[in-house]
Amino acid sequence: QRQMCIRDSFDDYIMSPNESLILIQTDTKPIYRHSFTANYYIFNVKNNKMEPLSTGGPQQVPLFSPDGNQIAFVRNNNIYLVKLLFNNSESQITTDGKYNEVLNGIPDWVYEEEFGFNRAFDFSADSKMIAYIRFDESKVPMYSFPLYKGKSPSLDQYATYPGEYEYKYPMPGIDNSKVSVHTFDIKSKVTRKIDLPLDEDGYIPRIKFTLSLIHI
């Protein structure tokens, strides 16, 4: 039987693996080329009910676990986990995320721009672990540029005086973010750092578990 979403409009959606749930994306606010925040709602196809993914603030890059029983997402540079079989209980996986210093599970500006992705974490195939990239951009200098009223969209707050936008931007020869890979065991809640055959200034352009669960 066809079910109707009870929300009048939305920006995008994500289906659960068995298509019994739909994540409804609303109130989308762009950050950079690929990244954005949004408010997500979990729509149950069977009972036609919808509830917020989280009430703690806008979310980024939500991802269903392969078994469809969990959703991980990023908020304020930290990774969170919602367990759908336990009344959508929410727990925080990382705690050191901080604006302009540390990003967990989402890339910095350079990675997003050059490698073209906005999510830096993944579930294992058995849904028991999460692997993620941690970006330490605390040593990357700030870069600023002026903001004017302009058009499409019009920034009316800068109609008389220009504003200024600052973000972390490494010029040639300046340090990039320091990157590392970590795993989180959902049952034991143990986080481990993975030793990688990577130079200090090396890149990690993607993160993905293999189906065998042996490699990342």
Predicted regions span which residues?
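Short, small-residue-biased leader/transition segments that mark boundaries at the very start
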Residues: 2-6
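Short coil/turn segments at the loop-to-beta-strand junctions that recur within blades
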Residues: 7, 56-60, 97-100, 198-202
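Beta-rich catalytic cores
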Residues: 9, 58, 117, 177, ...
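Residue-level detector of Asp-centered blade-edge/turn motifs that repeat once per structural unit
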Residues: 17-18, 66-67, 125-126, 211
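Hydrophobic beta-strand positions that form the internal "hydrophobic ladder"
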Residues: 22, 68-71, 130, 213-214
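Predominantly five- to eight-bladed beta-propeller fold
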Residues: 27-32, 36-39, 93-121, 129-187, ...
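Short loop/turn segments that connect beta-strands within beta-propeller blades
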Residues: 45-48, 84-87, 186-189
